[in-house]
Regions:
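Polytopic transmembrane helical bundles with strong interfacial aromatic enrichment
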Residues: 1-209
Length: 209
């Protein structure tokens, strides 16, 4: 991608910052949806999905905050600005961290699953705040460059690599969460006969799932 005529090469941070910000929000919505299904239909797999998404979501939120600070210094002249989107993204990080810490503190699996599901569902209220904070309050963040109904504001030499990065991030996240889910299932079922058979026979878990 070419240099930006105003920001120079510093705008390239966007190719990591924006995909990580989008993905950490998507993962939290995924957790909230899984929590709702788990509470209504009592599906154990939903708690597995939530536990698998937490570490990646927390890491990506941290990446979004750090890269945002790195981008903000040359663009805004400051490492940190207490505007709506920055603060709501920080709240998202604390939600991830809080759920992670709660899961470590609670030993009973049923109580852990229910508490996690409730907090995940309530926390989804923060996602629209992140999304629409640039419209609701004064903020240094610019409105969305990409919309479904309008042509991208940036040239194709810039938005095509950006699109590749977003798709790549989502593919990585999908693979990571599914892999963590498989490992979590094996851990929870470690005393089951079928898991012992896999361990003793040397078969790969992909033949089971």
């Amino acid at each position: 991608a070419p240099e930006d005529y105003q920001q120079g090469n510093s705008f390239r941070i966007m190719y990591v910052h924006v995909p990580s910000a989008l993905l950490c929000q998507s993962l939290y919505l995924f957790m909230g949806f899984a929590g709702f299904i788990g509470l209504v239909w009592r599906m154990k797999l939903t708690d597995v999905a939530i536990s698998a998404a937490i570490p990646l979501g927390m890491m990506l939120t941290a990446v979004a905050l750090i890269t945002g600070s790195l981008w903000g210094k040359p663009t805004w002249g400051t490492w940190w600005e207490w505007d709506g989107r920055t603060v709501s993204t920080l709240v998202l990080f604390f939600l991830y961290f809080g759920i992670y810490a709660l899961r470590q503190a609670i030993k009973d699996s049923s109580t852990k699953a229910n508490a996690t599901a409730i907090i995940a569902m309530v926390g989804t209220l923060n996602i629209p705040i992140i999304k629409y904070s640039v419209d609701w309050w004064y903020t240094l963040h610019q409105p969305a460059t990409f919309t479904i109904t309008e042509k991208p504001a940036m040239p194709s030499e810039m938005w095509l690599p950006f699109l590749v990065m977003v798709i790549g991030f989502y593919c990585f996240a999908g693979h990571n969460v599914i892999s963590r889910m498989r490992l979590e299932i094996l851990r929870r079922e470690s005393r089951s006969a079928w898991v012992r058979n896999i361990a003793t026979s040397g078969e790969k878990a992909r033949y089971v799932f």
